[in-house]
């Protein structure tokens, strides 16, 4: 019953329709959740620039927050934020073992308090999502970019791989495309790099034969590709 936040690239590892998922687009709420926690389990993430390097004020100060970091690459452990406990392990194997252990301790956990906290977060998600979706009422010309990802999600079938290429274009796409199926997002989020979308879309099509791919490109990214 712990809330789950992700990096931008990690979106969809837990479907954002799950009650425990905190959508990455709600940045203020993500910061609140990360500050509320006295213990953070970081799995397969280096806590890079899109995670504010795990530092205050977007995260609780390390003196007030313990961190367990799990990664298969030892160079990642503790690189950007001191880890209270560093675990060199495969994420899937670690989480399976952890789930088994926690199940045996469930009777000793104060789940009611956790469920109330999660319910509070869910109410904030509904409220903030409604504010964002007000952009979709804007029918002006030129088009509000919020419509692009929103309409694409309506047109393409569930499970379509989304490729977002372009600085602000990728941000808008993340804000208005809900990740409902794991492993269906492909982009280059570090420092807003441009021009990789075409190759990523082709790669996604090859990796998942017969599955549709939606590639949203903007901010001049298409011009970078042929260069």
Give the location of each predicted region.
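Glycine-rich, anion-gripping cofactor-binding loops and their flanking helix/strand elements
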Residues: 1-68, 180-211, 225-227
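Short gly/pro/ser/thr-enriched loop/turn and capping motifs at secondary-structure boundaries
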Residues: 10-15, 48-49, 74-78, 84, ...
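Conserved acidic residues
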Residues: 38, 84, 160
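Active-site metal-binding loops of divalent metal-dependent hydrolases
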Residues: 45-46, 218-220
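Terminal amphipathic helices with adjacent charged low-complexity linkers/tails
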Residues: 77-120
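Active-site diphosphate/adenylate-binding microenvironment
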Residues: 122-210
């Amino acid at each position: 019953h712990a809330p789950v936040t992700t990096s931008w690239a990690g979106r969809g590892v837990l479907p954002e329709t799950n009650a425990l998922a905190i959508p990455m687009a709600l940045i203020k709420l993500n910061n609140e959740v990360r500050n509320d926690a006295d213990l953070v389990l970081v799995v397969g993430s280096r806590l890079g620039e899109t995670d504010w390097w795990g530092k205050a004020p977007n995260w609780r100060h390390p003196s007030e927050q313990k961190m367990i970091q799990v990664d298969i690459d030892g160079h990642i452990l503790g690189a950007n934020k001191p880890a209270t406990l560093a675990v060199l392990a495969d994420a899937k194997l670690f989480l399976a073992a952890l789930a088994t252990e926690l199940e045996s301790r469930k009777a000793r956990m104060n789940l009611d308090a956790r469920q109330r906290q999660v319910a509070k977060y869910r109410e904030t998600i509904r409220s903030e999502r409604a504010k964002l979706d007000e952009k979709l009422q804007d029918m002006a010309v030129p088009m509000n970019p919020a419509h692009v990802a929103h309409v694409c999600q309506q047109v393409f079938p569930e499970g379509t791989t989304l490729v977002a290429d372009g600085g602000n274009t990728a941000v808008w796409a993340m804000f208005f495309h809900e990740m409902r199926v794991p492993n269906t997002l492909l982009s280059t989020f570090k420092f807003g790099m441009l021009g990789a979308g075409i190759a990523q879309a082709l790669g996604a099509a090859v990796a998942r034969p017969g599955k549709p791919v939606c590639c949203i490109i903007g901010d001049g990214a298409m011009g970078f590709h042929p260069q």
